[in-house]
Structure formats: structure tokens, C-alpha cells
Amino acid sequence: MIAILHNIRSNHNVGSIFRTADAAGCAKLYLCGITPAPIDRFGLPNKALAKVALGAEKTVVWEQVKSTLAALEKLKQEGYTIIALEQDKKAV
């Protein structure tokens, strides 16, 4: 399983997803758009994310990419089935 995190603003939410991905055995996280990464643009650790991730940011493989669509296309070409989740007033 691979997860794509698209434009998630909160360091705390991303840190929590790293923890969940670690527990679920997720092979990789793609961090897209404005989604914060464990290492910031200056090469420094993201302390707010790391505080919530509890070390999972060091064990879960991740890649920061600008284009969510490019990541999706790459995964489709590799044979992955794409499933999307979104919060919406009309969501089931």
C-alpha cells in the first residue's frame, strides 16, 4: 500500500498519518503540494511533525513531489489500483 497526501496543511495531521502508515505497513508516502515533510525546504527537521509522528517519520519511506497527478500516473503505470478519500458534505 502506498498513500498520497494531497495538500494537507497540518503538521500534526501529517505526523499522525506517518504513525498510522507505520502501523499499517504502508510502503511509501507521497507528500504532494503544500503537504509538509519531515525535512523542511532548508534541510532541517520539521519538529512539529516529528513530535506527533513519534519516530515514524524516520522509518516510513516518503517522497515529496509537486504534482499529485504525476504521482498518480506513475503509480497507475506501475499497476497500482487507485482509491481516493475526501471529506465532503455529500460524502458517503
Where are these predicted regions, by residue range?
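RNA substrate-binding interface of SAM-dependent RNA methyltransferases
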Residues: M1-Q87
